[in-house]
Amino acid sequence: MKMSSIRMLLVSLGVISVMPACLAVDWDTLQPRMVIPDKSVLQETFSKSGPVKKTTWQNRQGTRWSVEDGVLRGRPSSEEYQASRTHHYGYEPRVSVPVTPPEFVAGFSFRFVGGEESDIVPFIEFGHHVCRVKFSNKGTFLIVDHETLKVAESDEFKYVPGKWYHALAELKGDEFVIQFVDGPVWYVKHECLAKANSSGGNGLGLAGPKDGMVELDNVSIWKIRSQVKRSWPKRRNLFDVMNPELTGKGKKK
């Protein structure tokens, strides 16, 4: 299934005209490189305001999430919640999508608004502490295995607060591909990718800047077929793969 099917779905529902500016993107530039989409698990455009379905959107660390203005918007936890905690205070809005299959293809739009960048946030991840894309004003990088290994990076793809990002991620076995509109395409192969974390929020996840907000839109998640694309065995060899580097966290192990 092509990402353009999202646009076709929105047209058929008559909601294109009321969608936020994050839809001003050519989804045709984001098509699966590795996997073949199968059954749709989640298609969400957040057209109705209100509370979120907790079985689909799992708020983390007491942070607050609701559908507003055509997006899923996340805020930090309340001052009362933070005062009651000794750790995991919820200073940054965090959410996970537990309906994400173990192997998947997922397309989504997101942005981080306000707040402060730190060494940890903001990020998007796939599996809790399994595969994480960290956004920084110095560039963006991909870290895996409990953030111990940096396996991809781009100095040119810098974090811009308030900017909408559009991504397509694919995971099958120990292989992962993620691509961004007007950004990098990364391929990673690591054994940790095939192992779900036994704790925390699994599936697609996001964490915003400290004391800031996260906005999410245009979420489409599919199960995938058992076979990969015919072109994949050759295509995987075309990626420029960096030699993994231990992070500060990895060096302490």
What are these regions (language model features)?
Residues Q31-P32, E92-P98, E153-Y159, G205-L206:
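Beta-strand-rich interaction surfaces with strong enrichment in secreted/lumenal proteins
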Residues V25-N59, Q227-K253:
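Extracellular carbohydrate-recognition regions
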Residues G50-E80, K249-G250:
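Extracellular glycan-recognition surfaces and repeat-rich motifs
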Residues D145-H166:
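Short, aromatic/His-centered strand-loop micro-motif at the edge of beta-sheets
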Residues V188-N218:
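Flexible glycan-contacting loops in extracellular carbohydrate-active proteins
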Residues F46, D217-I221:
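Extracellular beta-strand elements of beta-rich domains used
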Residues P76-I143:
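Secretory/extracellular carbohydrate-interaction modules
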Residues F46, A106-F108, K163-F180:
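Short tryptophan-centered beta-strand motifs in secreted/extracellular beta-sheet-rich domains
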